[in-house]
Structures are given as C-alpha cells and as structure tokens.
Amino acid sequence: MLKKIFIRSSIGLLVATSLLFGYYFYFKYSFVEDLNYRSSVAETALGSIEYSLTGESDLVLLFIHGTPGGHDQTIEPSSYYRVLTPSRPGYLRTPLSVGKSPTEQAKAYKALLDSLGIKEVMILGFSGGGPAAIEFAAAYPETTLGFIALAAISHSEESWQRDDYEDEAFLNGSDFGLWFNFMLLEFLGDEAFVSFMLPNPINQQKLLKDPKQLENLKKTIWSIWPLSIRREGFINDYLQESNLSLHLTDIKVPTLVIHGTDDILVDISQGEAIARLVPNAKMYVVEGGGHMMMSTHSEEIEEAIENFFQKTVDFIGS
C-alpha cells in the first residue's frame, strides 16, 4: 500500500514539475519575443543599439533606464513629446562593447541619434541611467534641450564599494528563481505585492486605489527579467558606479532634478549633489516619494516633466 502511494506521489510530482517547467519555458520564450517585437536595432557608428520609440510628437525625450533594465523600462509618451528609450550597453540586444563607461555610453546615444536623424532631445536619466545622462548633457549641449535627473545616481558612495552579499546573490540568481518569486507575488495578490515593493504604507494604499499605476509598477518590476539577458549590463553598472567621476559642473543646459524624500535605493543626497553642482539647476522634491515614485506619484512627476519641457523649449525658441 505504501509503495503504491509513493509511486503515485512520485508520478504526480514528476507531472507537476514537468508542467511547471513547460509553462516557464513557454512564458520566457513569449516574453523575450515580445521584447524584441516592441523594439528595433539601429546599426550606428559605434555598433548595434536596441531602442524603442513611442509617441507622435516632433519633440523627443531620450529616456536612459536604470539598473537593471532595458528599453522596456521607460515612461509613456505625452501629447508634448515622443519617448526614445535605448537598451543601455550590456542590456538585452545592445552589446556591452558599445560602451562601458558613462562617457562611452553618452557617445553611443549620440551615435544613435545621428543614425535616427534626430537633432535635439531632452534627456532624462533614471536611477542607474543618471551617470550616462549626465555625461551626455555635459558633452553635447548643442543636442541637449535640457536634462532631467529622475532619482538619479550622481556619485559613488562608500557603501557601494563594500561586499554586498544580497546584491551578489541577485546578480548570480537564475531566471527561473526570479520568475518563480515574481509569479508567487502576483499569486498572493495586490496587497502582498505592494507591501513587498513599497515600504511606505501611505504609498501602498495610494497604489491599491489606482489600478493603472499598480499595473505600471508590475511592468517596471518585470523590466529586470530575464536577468540572463541583462546581467552583463548589471555587472558593468556596479563596476562603473563604484568609481564615478562625472562632469556635473560642465553641464550648461537647463536642468531639473526630481527626487523623492523616501528613496531608500538612491538617497536624495544624490539628487541634491546634482542640484548643487550643475549651474542654475532646479530641484523638485517629491514628498514621500520612494524609488518607485513614477507609479505612486505619477501625475505629479509627469506634470513637472512636461512643465519643464515646455518652459525650456519655449525659452529656447523665444
């Protein structure tokens, strides 16, 4: 009797495992196919650069994504601007050979613009995309209408140079393990998801009342997966961010710094340094905003970006 139970249990476990892995591989294949479908690859003077371009406006916002990420980690276009989002070197279909340092990556974005025939952009650097956006704004004032630093990294911190076993474990994690954790979070429901993602209870409740922004946060979370096709860029970012020396004081274009008071991933001091060192920079502080404030404070931030964009373009055109 016990032998039969054991055999049936083993068969059941084998079938369940086969179904789970079968679904996982189908999910991963479909996910990557969709990523590729929603992007293009430009052959530039510096190599292949993957990008997405959405919206209809003549004005372009060049969005430089965070760590880790890709062209799928971006923002929605508005009636005022299109959004161009390259996959940074080492992420998705942009090889790391295109540029490792922030300066090299800035040159790559200029090569992308040249390839696409785009003469001017407003550049926005989000989180780990901040260093390359800073270097771009400093090096190409004739191409840069203005610079927006959104929860952006601006300098190295001593803590980043120490061994961080949690980050190391994440860097070495498997696609399946991360997928399983994400699927489990979704299975547990929205309350469990926002509690895990957002430390601030006020932001948790705000997001639970806004299904659209809750969905946007889920998309942002999935923009770090599969890690295997983003890992090379992720590792490079860690190496670069441990020893940053950026040309902040060389930036001469209009600059807006947007940072949240509750950001525990990129401390507000990073944004304050940009506002202090960039001549005539303006700082917009999002009270209670964490690193995911584009979901929890979306209307406030979108309005700040559009107002800055419009005032800058109107000033240049006057």
Question: Model-predicted segments: where are they?
Answer:
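Alpha/beta-hydrolase
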Residues: 167-169, 180-246
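Conserved hydrolase catalytic core segment
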Residues: 120-161
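Catalytic active-site module of serine/aspartate enzymes centered on a nucleophile-bearing elbow/loop
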Residues: 281-318
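Conserved HGGG/HGGXW glycine-rich cap/lid loop of the alpha/beta-hydrolase fold
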Residues: 50-93
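Short beta-strand/loop motif that positions the catalytic acidic residue
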Residues: 251, 257-259, 263
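Conserved acidic catalytic loop of the alpha/beta-hydrolase fold
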Residues: 104-122
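Short alpha-helix in the alpha/beta-hydrolase fold that links the catalytic acid
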Residues: 253, 267-276
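Acidic catalytic loop of the alpha/beta-hydrolase fold
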Residues: 232, 262-266
